[in-house]
């Protein structure tokens, strides 16, 4: 029995590595459709509730940049169940549109936040005209894009001149002690806890692989600048376990 469990775990990890390498849009969609019922619960549990703080931090910075804008238009991409979109919607006068490729995640988002417009779609082909938004945000979703460069160019395209991209992603700490502790939790503890509550433990094997492969700090700001943004900065949060990128068109 133990051998069968070990084999299943090994197969799940290999599949996760394979998905991280291919980033098939259809596979990513299926994965998020599967985890949708337990997504919010596990997000808050596995981050110890700190994910809400990260969203609030991003929204606070966005609010300051939009002080002179009485009716900002905001697009939240890879919105999932809509938590970052809802946070951004608390900015005075903001009109928020949110987009995701998972129908199951969107069904939950619409029930939670009926005041927000939710659309099905994907980052590499945003269904909006040029210069439509003051802010484009994405919380914990950019590393799942099938084509990261194309997605960032689309962010740039739909932003108004002077507009901002706000992107939150997990970060692997640069401090060696924190890095070791983080990776032990991420690779060994997190998938096991997730497996107790989610039908798709595969998704939580994929998570650490996707974070490790994602270009971090200056590597990602270089991609943002290459995509047309005139400035791109990063702000590590909570002992460098998460990072906020802000880029201006």
Where would I find each of the regions flagged by the language model?
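N-terminal auxiliary segments of SAM/dcSAM-dependent transferases
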Residues: 2-30
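C-terminal alpha-helical "lid/dimerization" subdomain adjacent to the S-adenosyl-L-methionine
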Residues: 26-27, 101, 168-223, 227, ...
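Core SAM-dependent methyltransferase catalytic element
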Residues: 221, 227-249
């Amino acid at each position: 029995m133990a051998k069968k469990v070990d084999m299943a775990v090994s197969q799940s990890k290999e599949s996760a590595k394979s998905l991280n390498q291919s980033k098939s849009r259809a596979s990513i969609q299926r994965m998020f459709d599967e985890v949708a019922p337990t997504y919010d619960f596990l997000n808050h549990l596995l981050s110890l509730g700190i994910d809400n703080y990260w969203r609030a931090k991003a929204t606070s910075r966005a609010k300051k940049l939009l002080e002179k804008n009485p009716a900002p238009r905001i697009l939240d991409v890879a919105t999932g169940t809509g938590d970052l979109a809802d946070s951004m919607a608390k900015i005075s006068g903001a009109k928020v549109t949110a987009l995701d490729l998972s129908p199951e995640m969107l069904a939950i988002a619409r029930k939670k936040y009926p005041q927000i417009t939710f659309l099905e779609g994907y980052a590499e082909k945003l269904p909006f005209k040029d210069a439509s938004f003051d802010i484009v945000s994405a919380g914990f979703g950019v590393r799942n894009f099938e084509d990261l460069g194309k997605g960032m160019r689309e962010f740039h395209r739909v932003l108004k001149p002077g507009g901002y991209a706000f992107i939150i992603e997990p970060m692997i700490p640069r401090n060696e002690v924190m890095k070791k502790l983080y990776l032990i939790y991420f690779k060994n503890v997190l998938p096991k806890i997730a497996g107790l509550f989610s039908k798709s433990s595969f998704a939580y094997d994929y998570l650490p692989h996707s974070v490790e492969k994602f270009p971090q700090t200056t590597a990602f700001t270089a991609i943002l600048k290459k995509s047309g943004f005139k400035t791109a900065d990063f702000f590590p949060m909570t002992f460098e376990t998460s990072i906020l990128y802000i880029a201006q068109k």
